[in-house]
Structure formats: C-alpha cells, structure tokens
C-alpha cells in the first residue's frame, strides 16, 4: 500500500530541513563529480578510446567508493539519499513527505548539474559523457534500469530504513556503494547503469544533450517506487507502523 503524504511547508522549510537540502546538494555534487570525473579521466587516458573491461571496472569502483563516502557524509543530516529514485522509494514507503522529497530532488539535481559544469571547467572543456543505451532498445534500457534501481533501493531499505536493521545500519553506506558498483558492472555496457536520475540529468544539462534522458527518469523512479512498495508492505508493515520509524 502506497503511503505517500504531502507534508507541510512549515516542516519542509524548517532549519533542519534546510540543512538537509544543503547536505544533499553537497554530497550529490561530490558523488557526481567523482563518478563523471572517472569517465572523463578514462577517456583522457585512452585518448577517447572505447570503453573496455578495465575501464568499466575502474568507473564502477569510482562510483561505488564515491557513493559510499557521499552517503556516509550526509546520512546523519539528510539520510544520505543523493538520488531522486531513492527519495521517491522512501516517499512511497512513508519515510519522507512529497513536499520535502521535491525539495530533495531540487538539491540533488542542482548538485549534479553544478558538478558537471565544474568538471567541464577544470578539464578545459572536455566533453561530458552522457548516459545512453547501447546494443539494446530504449524500452529494454528502461527495464534494465527498473531492475538495478529496485536492487539499489531495496538495499537502502534493508540496511538503512528497516527499523530492525540493528547494527546492520553501520554498513549501510558500504552496502549501498557495493550494489551500485555491481550494477554498473552488470548494466554499464547496455543502459549505462545509472539508477539515478540526477546522475544522468547533470551530464545532460552540461552537455546540452537530453536524447534518451527519459529512460533514466522512468526506469529508476519505477524501480525505486516498486522497492519501496514491496519492502514497506511485505516486511516493515508486518511488524511496525511506518509512522514510528526514524529514517531518514
């Protein structure tokens, strides 16, 4: 059962909420800077060569490490979402209101866009790589993104949002980073392995190229929403009302 709640402007504009938006902006900026930066660095080192297995592994590791750190640095302030799909998945489960979630989205999208413009500047105008499907159709890309984003948001629920997580919560940032790295290894050659509308939106803004960008909104949001619905209804709802939970 979907537990979406609109929320109030008073709560969404409180001092604590404003700090959360700043934390999301900074953490998303740093994550995207490292993630997209790793792809630019690979292109520079190979003189624009095609992505090979070593490059895919390097980029996956960079994203995993950067997300691990980004979630860790923002977790105590905003919950460490860094991703509109994670925010949406948590909203579906009743962990964040729609209004606050929208403002999280704004912070995340701004952070990702600023990161890519910074990369464009500090690399002396290097092309910003954008996500796009390769060897598959856009619909197949959407399905791929649904599956891998479901895995990501399900991991967020299991390690961070579940009230019975106990000491497992201490490894949540690491687990979240690991699943993103693994999914990039699996989906990178096909859909790009985004799982994150902000991660795809920032490069599209900086490059001025939104071709196929809808894939990285529809897929991740559907996957994140399904994960929130499944984990929230099947597991969390069976032992504790959502209103009593602490995350984010």
From Swiss-Prot:
UniProt membrane topology term: Multi-pass membrane protein
Chief location category: membrane
Expressing tissues: Specifically expressed in roots.
Signal sequence segment: none
A Gene Ontology biological process term: water transport
Motif (NPA 2) on chain: 196-198
Pfam families per record: MIP (PF00230)
Span of the annotated motif NPA 1: 83-85
Family matches, as Gene3D superfamilies: Glycerol uptake facilitator protein (1.20.1080.10)
Entry GO MF terms: water channel activity
Segments crossing the lipid bilayer: 20-40, 54-74, 97-119, 141-161, 168-188, 217-237
InterPro entries: Aquaporin-like (IPR023271), Aquaporin_transptr (IPR034294), MIP (IPR000425), MIP_CS (IPR022357)
Keyword Cell membrane among record annotations: yes
GO (cellular component) term, any one: membrane
Subcellular location: Cell membrane
Keywords: Cell membrane, Membrane, Repeat, Stress response, Transmembrane, Transmembrane helix, Transport
Induction / repression: By salt and osmotic stress. Expressed in roots with a circadian rhythm showing an increase at the end of the night period, a peak during the first part of the light period and then a decrease.
Keyword Hydrolase recorded: no
PROSITE patterns membership: MIP (PS00221)
Comment field on protein domains: Aquaporins contain two tandem repeats each containing three membrane-spanning domains and a pore-forming loop with the signature motif Asn-Pro-Ala (NPA).
Family as reported in the entry's similarity comment: Belongs to the MIP/aquaporin (TC 1.A.8) family. TIP (TC 1.A.8.10) subfamily.
Function in brief: Water channel required to facilitate the transport of water across cell membrane.
Protein name: Aquaporin TIP2-3
Species, as recorded: Zea mays
């Amino acid at each position: 059962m979907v537990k979406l709640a609109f929320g109030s402007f008073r709560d969404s504009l409180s001092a604590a909420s404003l700090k959360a938006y700043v934390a999301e902006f900074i953490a998303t900026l740093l994550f995207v800077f490292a993630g997209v930066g790793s792809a630019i660095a690979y292109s520079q080192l190979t003189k624009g060569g095609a992505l090979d297995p070593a490059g895919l592994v390097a980029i996956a590791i960079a994203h995993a490490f950067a997300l691990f750190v980004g979630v860790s640095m923002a977790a105590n302030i905003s919950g460490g979402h860094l991703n509109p799909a994670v925010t949406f998945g948590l909203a579906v489960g009743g962990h964040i209101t729609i209004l606050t979630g929208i403002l999280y989205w704004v912070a995340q999208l701004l952070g990702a866009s600023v990161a890519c413009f910074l990369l464009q500047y500090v690399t002396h105008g290097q092309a910003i790589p954008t996500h796009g499907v390769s060897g598959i159709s856009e619909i197949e890309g959407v399905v791929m993104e649904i599956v891998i984003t479901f895995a990501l948001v399900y991991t967020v629920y299991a390690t961070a949002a579940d009230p019975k997580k106990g000491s497992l919560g201490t490894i949540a940032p690491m687990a979240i980073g690991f699943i993103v790295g693994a999914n990039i290894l699996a989906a990178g050659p096909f859909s790009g392995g985004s799982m994150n509308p902000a991660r795809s939106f920032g490069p599209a803004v900086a490059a001025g190229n939104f071709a196929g960008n809808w894939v990285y909104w529809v897929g991740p949001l559907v996957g994140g929403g399904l994960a929130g619905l499944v984990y929230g209804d099947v597991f969390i709802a069976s032992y504790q009302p959502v209103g009593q939970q602490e995350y984010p």
